[in-house]
C-alpha cells in the first residue's frame, strides 16, 4: 500500500462548487473511474464505468466519476446523463491525477478514507480492473461485478494522463523557428516507430508539425539494400506549417543504403548522423558503394557528419541487463531517438512512459529500450557536439485539446461521428488493401460506438455487403485503393441505379495495376468521375490534410444520406499515413444529419387504396427510403431501369432518357459552399488545387505573395458537383495553373467545363509536391 498526499487536492463538483478531495471521502473509501473527455479511449469505457460503479452503489463505498482536464460544462457534455445517477467531480488541472501518479486514462482507482490507495488500474486492462473490483468487493463484503462483460471493448493502453508536456528550453540550446529531420534505415530498423515517437514528443511539447512516412512495399526487403530503405520525415515548428518540409536539415542514416538513397534530399550544409557500425564491406556493397564514404570520397563534402557507433554502444549498455546481443541490436533505434531528442531539446518523459506502456510485461525489452534511449541522450550531452543543440518553442496554436492524428484515423473517427450525427449505425464492408487497411484496423475497435465491420473475401463482396447494409438502413461504407475501385465499379453502378446512400473511400496510390502500393499519387479522379458503364454520375469529395479527413467523412455521409446516392471520398497514401496536430472539435458544434424513412403509403392506386412507390422524390430528388420489413411498404429495387415513381421495370425510351437526366440533376442539387480565395484577392494567377496538394500550394502561394506576386489559391473539396462560383473565379484570372499528382486530370475537366486555358503542373513520382517546387512554378508563370 502506498500513501499519496491527495487529501488536500482541490477538485470541483459537476455543479461547479470547489471542494477538497479528502472531504469527499467521508467515512467510506472512494471508488473512481477517471476519464479524459477529449479522447475516444475514455469514451469507449463509459458504459463499462457506469456498470461497475452502479454495481457498488449501496455498498459501504462512495463511487464517483472524475473528469480530468475539463471544466464542469465540458464534463457534463461528455458524460451525458451519467452525473444524474453517479457522483461526478472535475479535476480541471489534473492535480488529483498527478497525486495518484496515474500515467494513462481511463483509470480505475480505489482510495481509502485516510488517503491510502487500495489500487489503480490504468488504461483498459480487463484483468486489472477485475482484480481491483474483486478486492473492493471483498473489502466491502459486496458481490463482485462482471468484468469484463460481453459488450465491453477489447483491452487497450489508454492515453497520457497528464495532457501536454511543458517544454524546458535548455540554456545551451540555440532557439530556431523550425527544423526538418529525416530518419532512414532498413525496414526492420524501426524508423517509423522512431519518427512517430519523436513526433509525439514534439506534439506534447506544443509544436506544430507535419510528417511524411515512406516505406517499401515489401514486408521485409533484403536487409541493407536500397529497396528496403524505410524513412520518416518530420518538420516541427514554432509557427503554423502545412508540409513536412522542402528538404531535411538532418538525416539520421542507420546504414549505408539509407545514406545512399536519402543523402541527395538533404540541404547543403546539413547534418548527417550515421550508425558507423553498419558501414562494413558487405553492407557497402549492397548499397552500391565501392568505398566507405565515411573514410574516403567526396559524397559527404559540405555536410556536418556525426559518426556514432550506435550498435556497439547499445549492446554495451544492455550487456549488464541480461539482454542478448542480437536482441540489444533491435534497440539501436532508441539510441538514435535519444540522441536526436537531446539535440532538439525534446521532453524525454513521453518516450520513457510510452516504452513502459507499450512493452508492459516484457521487462527485458523495456529495460533495453530505456537503456538505449537514455544512452543516446547521454551521448549527446557528453560527445561535445558543439553548437548542435537547438530548441523550438511551442507554436501559438488556438486554445483547446490537441492530438496528433493520421488521415486514416481521422477518417475513421469522422465516419463514427457521422454515424452518431445521423443516428444510423455504421457498417464497414472491406477487403484489406494498402494504404486503406488502417481504416479497418481503427474501426474494428469501435464496436461499442455502433460500428460493425466485415472483412470480405474480395473487393466485390466488400462493396456488395456495404450496399446491402445501406438497403437495411445502415450508413454503408467500403474502403479501398485504385485497383479495388476498378473491381467495385459494377456494384457502384448498381448503387447509382438503386439510389441508396453508400460511401466508397479511395485511398489513392501509384498505379497502374499493383503499381506503387506504399507510395502516394492522386490519379483516380477520372476513374471516380467516369469509371462506370452508362451514365452513372455520383458526388465526389476529397480531403486536403490528415485532420480534414474527419470533416470530409462527415460531409460524404451528409451527401449520401441526404441525397440517397453513393459518394466517392478521395484521399491518398500521403494523407493516410502522415500526421499533424488536430484540435479536437466540440461534438455539440457538429451539425446533425437528418434522415427520414418512409413509414406510410405515399400514393393512391386507381382503386383508392394506399400504395408505396419507392421512387417518389423530395425537393432534392432523393427517393423515399423504406427499411425492409416496414409494414405495408414492401417494394422492389434492382439494376434494371425503373419507372420513376412506381419503381416498376421499364424499357420505355422516354422514361430512360428522363431517368438519366434525373440522376444527373440529383447530383447537381448537392449543396456545395462557395470557394474562398486564399492569398491575393486581386490575383493575376489563380492556383486551383485538390486533395493533398493543399499544404504545398498554400506554402508556395504565401511565399510568392510575400514577395509581391499577385497569386490566389482555391482548393476544391467538392469535385462533383463543382462549387457554383468556380467559373466566376476562373474568369477573373489572367492565368490559371492546376498542380496535381497525376498527368492533369482536374485540368482536363476544368478546360472542358469552363473553356479556360488551365496549365497543368504535374508530379507522379510517388512523393508529394514541395512548397519550393511550386513556388518556382508560380514565379516562372507570372514572369513569363
Which functions belong to the PLM regions below?
Residues 1-29, 44, 54, 58-67, ...:
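Non-globular targeting/processing and membrane-anchoring segments
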Residues 34-48:
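Conserved redox-active cysteine motifs that mediate thiol-disulfide chemistry
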Residues 79-105, 109, 556:
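Short, internal strand/loop/helix patches
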Residues 106-122:
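A short, hydrophobic beta-strand/beta-hairpin element that forms part of a small beta-sheet core
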Residues 169-422:
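Active-site cofactor/cluster-binding pocket
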Residues 178-267, 413, 418, 426-427, ...:
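Thiamine diphosphate
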Residues 245, 251, 300-303, 307-314, ...:
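Conserved thiamine diphosphate
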Residues 397, 404-414, 422, 552, ...:
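Flexible, low-complexity linker and terminal segments
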Amino acid at each position: 500500500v502506498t500513501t499519496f498526499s491527495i487529501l488536500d487536492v482541490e477538485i470541483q463538483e459537476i455543479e461547479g462548487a470547489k471542494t477538497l478531495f479528502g472531504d469527499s471521502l467521508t467515512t467510506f473509501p472512494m471508488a473512481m473511474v477517471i476519464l479524459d473527455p477529449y479522447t475516444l479511449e475514455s469514451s469507449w469505457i463509459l458504459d463499462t464505468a457506469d456498470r461497475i460503479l452502479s454495481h457498488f452503489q449501496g455498498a459501504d463505498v462512495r463511487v464517483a466519476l472524475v473528469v480530468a482536464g475539463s471544466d464542469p460544462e465540458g464534463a457534463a457534455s461528455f458524460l451525458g446523463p451519467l452525473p444524474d445517477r453517479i457522483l461526478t467531480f472535475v479535476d480541471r488541472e489534473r492535480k488529483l491525477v498527478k497525486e495518484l501518479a496515474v500515467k494513462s486514462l481511463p483509470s480505475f482507482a480505489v482510495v481509502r478514507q485516510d488517503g491510502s490507495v487500495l489500487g489503480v488500474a490504468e488504461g483498459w486492462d480487463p484483468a486489472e480492473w477485475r482484480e481491483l473490483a474483486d478486492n473492493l468487493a471483498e473489502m466491502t463484503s459486496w458481490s463482485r461485478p462482471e468484468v469484463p462483460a460481453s459488450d465491453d471493448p477489447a483491452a487497450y493502453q489508454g492515453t497520457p494522463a497528464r495532457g501536454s508536456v511543458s517544454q524546458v528550453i535548455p540554456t545551451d540550446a540555440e532557439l530556431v523557428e523550425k527544423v526538418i529531420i529525416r530518419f532512414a534505415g532498413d525496414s526492420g530498423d524501426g524508423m517509423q516507430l522512431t519518427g512517430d515517437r519523436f513526433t509525439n514528443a514534439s506534439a506534447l511539447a506544443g509544436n506544430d508539425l507535419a510528417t511524411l512516412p515512406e516505406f517499401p512495399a515489401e514486408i521485409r526487403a533484403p536487409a541493407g539494400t536500397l529497396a528496403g530503405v524505410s524513412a520518416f520525415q518530420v518538420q516541427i515548428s514554432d509557427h503554423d506549417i502545412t508540409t513536412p518540409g522542402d528538404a531535411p536539415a538532418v538525416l539520421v542514416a542507420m546504414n549505408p543504403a539509407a545514406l545512399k538513397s536519402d543523402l541527395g534530399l538533404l540541404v547543403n550544409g546539413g547534418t548527417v548522423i550515421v550508425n558507423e557500425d553498419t558501414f562494413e564491406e558487405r553492407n557497402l556493397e549492397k548499397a552500391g558503394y565501392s568505398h566507405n564514404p565515411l573514410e574516403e570520397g567526396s559524397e559527404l563534402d559540405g555536410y556536418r557528419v556525426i559518426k556514432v557507433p550506435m550498435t556497439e554502444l547499445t549492446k554495451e549498455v544492455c550487456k549488464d541487463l541480461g539482454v542478448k546481443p542480437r536482441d540489444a541490436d533491435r534497440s539501436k533505434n532508441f539510441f538514435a531517438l535519444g540522441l536526436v531528442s537531446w539535440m532538439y531539446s525534446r521532453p524525454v518523459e513521453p518516450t520513457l512512459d510510452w516504452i513502459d506502456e507499450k512493452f508492459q510485461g516484457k521487462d527485458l525489452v523495456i529495460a533495453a529500450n530505456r537503456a538505449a534511449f537514455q544512452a543516446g541522450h547521454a551521448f549527446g550531452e557528453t560527445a561535445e557536439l558543439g553548437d548542435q543543440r537547438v530548441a523550438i518553442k511551442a507554436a501559438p496554436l488556438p486554445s483547446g485539446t490537441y492530438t496528433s492524428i493520421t488521415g486514416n484515423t481521422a477518417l475513421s473517427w469522422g465516419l463514427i461521428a457521422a454515424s452518431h450525427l445521423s443516428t444510423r449505425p455504421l457498417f464497414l464492408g472491406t477487403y484489406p488493401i494498402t494504404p486503406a487497411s488502417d481504416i479497418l484496423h481503427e474501426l474494428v475497435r469501435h464496436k461499442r460506438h455502433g460500428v460493425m465491420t466485415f472483412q470480405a473475401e474480395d473487393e466485390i463482396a466488400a462493396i456488395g455487403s456495404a450496399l446491402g447494409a445501406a438497403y437495411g438502413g445502415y450508413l454503408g461504407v467500403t474502403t479501398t485503393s485504385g485497383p479495388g475501385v476498378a473491381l467495385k465499379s459494377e456494384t457502384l453502378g448498381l448503387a447509382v441505379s438503386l439510389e441508396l446512400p453508400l460511401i466508397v473511400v479511395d485511398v489513392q496510390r501509384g498505379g497502374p495495376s499493383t503499381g506503387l502500393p506504399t507510395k502516394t499519387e492522386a490519379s483516380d479522379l477520372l476513374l471516380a468521375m467516369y469509371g462506370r458503364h452508362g451514365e452513372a454520375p455520383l458526388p465526389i469529395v476529397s480531403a486536403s490534410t490528415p485532420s480534414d479527413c474527419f470533416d470530409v467523412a462527415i460531409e460524404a455521409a451528409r451527401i449520401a444520406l441526404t441525397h440517397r446516392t453513393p459518394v466517392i471520398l478521395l484521399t491518398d497514401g500521403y494523407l493516410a499515413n502522415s500526421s499533424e496536430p488536430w484540435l479536437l472539435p466540440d461534438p455539440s458544434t457538429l451539425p446533425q444529419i437528418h434522415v427520414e424513412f418512409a413509414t406510410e403509403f405515399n400514393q393512391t392506386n386507381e382503386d383508392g387504396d394506399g400504395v408505396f412507390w419507392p421512387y417518389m422524390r423530395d425537393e432534392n430528388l432523393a427517393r423515399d427510403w423504406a427499411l425492409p420489413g416496414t409494414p405495408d411498404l414492401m417494394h422492389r429495387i434492382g439494376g434494371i431501369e425503373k419507372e420513376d415513381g412506381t419503381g416498376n421495370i421499364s424499357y420505355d425510351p422516354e422514361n430512360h432518357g428522363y431517368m438519366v437526366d434525373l440522376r444527373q440533376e440529383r447530383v447537381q442539387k448537392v449543396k456545395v459552399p462557395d470557394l474562398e480565395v486564399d492569398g491575393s484577392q486581386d490575383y493575376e494567377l489563380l492556383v486551383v488545387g485538390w486533395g493533398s496538394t493543399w499544404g504545398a500550394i498554400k506554402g508556395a502561394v504565401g511565399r510568392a505573395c510575400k514577395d509581391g506576386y499577385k497569386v490566389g489559391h482555391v482548393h476544391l473539396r467538392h469535385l462533383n458537383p463543382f462549387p457554383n462560383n468556380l467559373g466566376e473565379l476562373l474568369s477573373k484570372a489572367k492565368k490559371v495553373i492546376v498542380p496535381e499528382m497525376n498527368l492533369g486530370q482536374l485540368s482536363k475537366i476544368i478546360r472542358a467545363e469552363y473553356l479556360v486555358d488551365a496549365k497543368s503542373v504535374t508530379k507522379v513520382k510517388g512523393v508529394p509536391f514541395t512548397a519550393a517546387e511550386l513556388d518556382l512554378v508560380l514565379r516562372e508563370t507570372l514572369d513569363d
